[in-house]
Amino acid sequence: SYRANYNASLVKIKQVSSLASEGIYYRLSTMLTKPVNISQTMAHDSLLIKLLEEEGSRYQEAGYQETIRKYLDTYKNKYAYDSVFLVSASTNNYYNFNGLDRNLARGEDENVWYYNFLQSGEEYSLNIDNDEVAGAANKITLFVNCRIRDASGRVIGVVGVGVNVDYIKGLLQEYEKEYDVATYLINEKGEIEVSSLYNGHQTADWFKVNDSEDI
């Protein structure tokens, strides 16, 4: 009957949607797990912890800054990330694969992510922002931020990696073609973080974009 066929079609649609969601979720989880794991590995590296503990006495040494630069550059090249960075909690100096980049002064909009993360209590977080480092052309980037603690548990720095959002958008476009569905990464507020059309730096409400405000 029509109703039986209709109900069967609904079940099939739900099954396909569920499989698509699971497949996309698995792939995205796999993609995001690696940069988180790499960032956590650096956060627990005794060499990096020692370098941060020695910053006060060695900061002016050219060799000190070069050691940090080489360390971060090695991770960038090995894992092909767009950015690898380190921030000292004692000086707020921001280092990346090119060396000392800048100081993250409190009260400046582009540094809010850093102070919010320190105050959050989270061991790691993901945020989307412009890459402010020299030569990055302000590209929209997904950053992983991880706390670095000394032996007593005191936070002495933040380390992490960055992945260009265009790369993630490209993956979502591939998934949309493969599964014939629209894909979005949204936060707890219902705002679109990344999709094939949005880069996360624009504020877009998923419910409004999809005319689903009554859900």
Q: What are the residue ranges of the model-derived segments?
A:
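Juxtamembrane extracytoplasmic/periplasmic/luminal helical "stalk" adjacent to the first N-terminal
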Residues: 1-57
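Generic recognition of well-ordered alpha-helical segments
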Residues: 19-26, 37, 70, 112, ...
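Short hydrophobic alpha-helical segments used for membrane anchoring or interfacial signaling
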Residues: 44, 84-92, 182-190
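Amphipathic coiled-coil signal-relay and dimerization helices
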Residues: 49-52, 87-99, 190-197
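Extracytoplasmic/periplasmic sensor domains and loops in membrane signaling proteins
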Residues: 58-71, 98-131, 197-215
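Solvent-exposed, extracytoplasmic
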Residues: 65-78, 154, 158-202, 210-213
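Extracytoplasmic/periplasmic ligand-binding sensor regions of membrane-associated signaling proteins
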Residues: 77-80, 88-164, 168-170, 174
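Short loop/turn microsegments at loop-to-beta-strand junctions
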Residues: 82-83, 143-144, 180-182
